[in-house]
């Protein structure tokens, strides 16, 4: 009869995650909870269970769910700027590339982190204090950039005279609606098109509608 293998000594057991790794894991799992249930519907017990630790262990990293929620939104605020690679294209007036890259950046950021859109919606609906800085730094900045671009290109004669702010909202609205339908309502099978196809279609519809017509140029 063979002997029962001895358990691994402590030095050979699976190492515990480092503090920074555990903190990142908590934020990642908490984002999933908040994105599904909102702030009010999520408890520290829910988060600890997702991470696989006790509530007492969770409190070693964060004093409560308010701190976790704020850390998640603060992390999203500090994420890479979507506009940085688009600004040179805008300076050169490369309309199709500007709108295509903007649409792709929005789609890919949400597809890579599905909790992002849900968190933003819940933060606004629940009136969380972090919702305002998130909106100002990420959402409003994007809309203002596009508003200024449409206004400039209209002045240059490339676009017809539309309200720039409404034009910006119309374009962003197409993309965001697509993301909400897929990520919030779960209709991925109904809209399985890859990001490149989605962006190209929306950009064509938008630019065909906003492009200056010959009579607009003559009047200008």
Where are these regions (language model features)?
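N-terminal intrinsically disordered/low-complexity leader segments
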Residues: 1-21, 85-88, 214-220
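Amphipathic C-terminal alpha-helical segment
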Residues: 3, 108-112, 143, 148, ...
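Generic hydrophobic, amphipathic alpha-helix propensity
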Residues: 22-30, 47, 72-76, 80, ...
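Helix-turn-helix
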Residues: 25, 33-67, 71-72
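Short hydrophobic clusters on alpha-helical segments that form packing/core surfaces
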Residues: 26-34, 106, 206
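Hydrophobic alpha-helical connector segments
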Residues: 84-115, 167-171, 199
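Amphipathic alpha-helical segments used for helix-helix packing
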Residues: 110-132, 180-185
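Amphipathic alpha-helical packing segments from all-alpha helical-bundle domains
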Residues: 112, 119, 129-156, 165-166, ...
